[in-house]
Amino acid sequence: MEPSPLELPVDAVRRIATELNCDPTDERVALRLDEEDKLKRFKDCFYIPKMRDLPSIDLSLVNEDDNAIYFLGNSLGLQPKMVKTYLEEELDKWAKIGAYGHEVGKRPWIIGDESIVSLMKDIVGAHEKEIALMNALTVNLHLLLLSFFKPTPKRHKILLEAKAFPSDHYAIESQIQLHGLDVEKSMRMIKPREGEETLRMEDILEVIEKEGDSIAVVLFSGLHFYTGQLFNIPAITQAGHAKGCFVGFDLAHAVGNVELHLHDWDVDFACWCSYKYLNSGAGGLAGAFIHEKHAHTIKPALVGWFGHELSTRFNMDNKLQLIPGVNGFRISNPPILLVCSLHASLEIFQQATMTALRRKSILLTGYLEYLLKHYHGGNDTENKRPVVNIITPSRAEERGCQLTLTFSISKKGVFKELEKRGVVCDKREPEGIRVAPVPLYNSFHDVYKFIRLLTAILDSTERN
């Protein structure tokens, strides 16, 4: 699931420290890492929030003209600067030529989604005809489950991780109820072992092996929203197929974050949103994938006009010519204004490439982990200082850019103090603070400054 072997983050930090004749925690290491960063120019493609504009900022603690430390791309990505330009292009076209905009221009409205789908294929590792840009994530999940979840008396379960994102949980629960099944019997959730935060792959594979004959669909998140755990998508897919199950994934926290190869991994179906790592703005246009092997066998349960072949769509004879594959699942006219914001971001990804972004991300988050463990690891019974625990897996192949932190003191106070100092992250129940340095627009110096602020907050808490 990873690019070719590369220098481990801790080794890179120590190498640079040796070259500079300084401690690995020195600020000069962060600055050198930024100098060596081949992707640093892409930060200029985004608007970075200023300290003065943040609602929870304490201006007595910061320089109001400084950029915020924005570590929340796992919730909402920053705005690409070209979004306004692309929106204005379509608004101007609408104003000047009205309905002619459906057929002319850079993004003809009738094929607005299709005009940018080629930019998505390398991000998810799929053929163009396997991808549709439409709707919102949970809408797409419902549409996909209506076609892939066909329970029988013997094979009636959907397998998912416990504490999946609520929207996934509700969607699966309601799909089971739609078929008149008992949720308690047909919704199979895998929990971490007692005392552990994340799932072990061997436990997932064991459940699939033992219960697979009764499982209709295996449906996991690609990367867990709370723990930050990246699941082994090809291994889960292979195990599910060996037992005759369809295998699908919610890639909300994986797309644009880690490398994906949905076609080569033989995933049956997947869906994702675009407002996190894909930076399309709140409620942005979502995506869906169906493997080409299902193009002529899996049909949409609900059909609309935009699932009809374009070549005969305007014959108006009400004789459906369904587009094979996932594009037959499209129901309505693509929302061109949402297409614009996604277009602006996908062009940046095309220039940066997922392989290069992932390589930087491994180093960036590894540097964050190194500093956290250096300053705030250990056992609070030994040193009586507040301790930061990282519940996200330490191995790069088992996580994306996000680290989920828990504290030996109340997270609410820590979070409030971070906000006052211009750190944009979030807290998630029950105990986590999520921080996600994004390689497109975050720097190693951002990480260094975050650690300085966190350390000052925890030191102050200790003194008080």
From Swiss-Prot:
Tissue expr: High levels in liver and kidney. Also detected in heart, retina, ovary. Lung, testis and brain.
pH dependence: Optimum pH is about 9.0 with L-kynurenine as substrate, and about 8.5 with DL-3-hydroxykynurenine as substrate.
Modified residues (N6-(pyridoxal phosphate)lysine): 276
Cofactor(s) recorded in Swiss-Prot or TrEMBL: pyridoxal 5'-phosphate
Regulation of its activity: Inhibited by o-methylbenzoylalanine (OMBA).
Catalytic activity line of the entry: L-kynurenine + H2O = anthranilate + L-alanine + H(+); 3-hydroxy-L-kynurenine + H2O = 3-hydroxyanthranilate + L-alanine + H(+)
GO cellular component assignments: cytoplasm; cytosol; mitochondrion
NCBIfam families named among the record's database cross-references: kynureninase
Protein name: Kynureninase
Lineage: Eukaryota, Metazoa, Chordata, Craniata, Vertebrata
